Amino acid sequence: MTDIPADDPKIELRSDITVELVKSAATDSDVLFAARVSTAGEQSLDELKKDPERSKGLINYLMRDRHGSPFEHNSMTFFVSAPIFVFREFMRHRVGWSYNEESGRYRELQPVFYAPDASRKLVQQGRPGKYVFVEGTPEQHELVGSAMEDSYRQAYATYQQMLAAGVAREVARAVLPVGLYSSMYATCNARSLMHFLGLRTQHELAKVPSFPQREIEMAGEKMEAEWARLMPLTHAAFNANGRVAP
C-alpha cells in the first residue's frame, strides 16, 4: 500500500447502504379517498368505512389501468447514507422527489468510503444493454480492496492538507472520490417511489426487466420494505400488476 504520513487520519470502509424512514403520512386509505372523490364528492371520506375487499379491488383497478394521481396523496421521508456515486443515480429521479444532501461547502467531510464486500459481483460479461455480472476471483477482490483503500487514503490526506493550509472546503473537496459516503433526506410519494423501484430493483414479478447497479438497488430494497409496511394493499397491487408505476 501507498505510504501515508503517520499523522494522517484513519479512514473507515463500509459496504452497506442505510435507509431510515424518518416520517410518513402514507396509508392505503389515502389512495381510496383520493380516488373516490371523483364519484362521491364530499362523501368520499365516508367510503373508507366500507368493505375492505372492495377497497382492495379499487386499488388494484387503479394500478392495473394506470390511474396514477390517487397514489400521490401521501408522503414518506427517508434518511439515506450511501456513497456519492449512488446519489448521482438517485437524483436522476426528479418528479415527485425532494432532496437535501450533506454539504461539502459548509462542513468538513468525514473519511468514510465505500468498498465492496465479498458478496459483490465484480465482473461484467456481455455487451452494453445485454450483460450479466459474475463473481470475481479472490485476486480481483484483493486488488479492488487494496486499490480503493490506497486511493481513498491519498485523496483524504490531500484534502486534509489543503484544509490545514487554509484552502476553502468547497475547493479542497474537489479531490475526494465518488466512493465517499454522503447523507441526505429524500421525500417521495407512493407513485414516485414505484417508478424508482421499477427502474432500480430487479424482481421476478416485474413485467419490464431492469438492470440496476447493486448499490442503489440496496437502497431501493430498504425503502420498499418500509413502504410495504405502510401501504400493504398498494404494494401488493404494484407486485400483482408487474411492478409498473401507474
UniProtKB/Swiss-Prot annotation:
Ranges for domain ThyX come to: 17-241
Q: What is its EC number?
A: 2.1.1.148
Cofactor: how and how many bound:
Binds 4 FAD per tetramer. Each FAD binding site is formed by three monomers.
Catalytic reaction(s) noted: dUMP + (6R)-5,10-methylene-5,6,7,8-tetrahydrofolate + NADPH + H(+) = dTMP + (6S)-5,6,7,8-tetrahydrofolate + NADP(+)
**Cofactor(s) for this UniProt protein:** FAD
- Keywords for the protein's UniProt record, in alphabetical order: FAD, Flavoprotein, Methyltransferase, NADP, Nucleotide biosynthesis, Transferase
The record's section on InterPro entries has: Thymidylate_synthase_ThyX (IPR003669), Thymidylate_synthase_ThyX_sf (IPR036098)
Task: List, in alphabetical order, the Gene Ontology terms for molecular function in this entry.
Answer: flavin adenine dinucleotide binding; NADPH binding; thymidylate synthase (FAD) activity; thymidylate synthase activity
The record's family statement is: Belongs to the thymidylate synthase ThyX family.
Q: How does it assemble?
A: Homotetramer.
This chain belongs to the protein called Flavin-dependent thymidylate synthase
* The species this protein was found in: Streptomyces coelicolor (strain ATCC BAA-471 / A3(2) / M145)
Lineage at the top is: Bacteria, Bacillati, Actinomycetota, Actinomycetes, Kitasatosporales
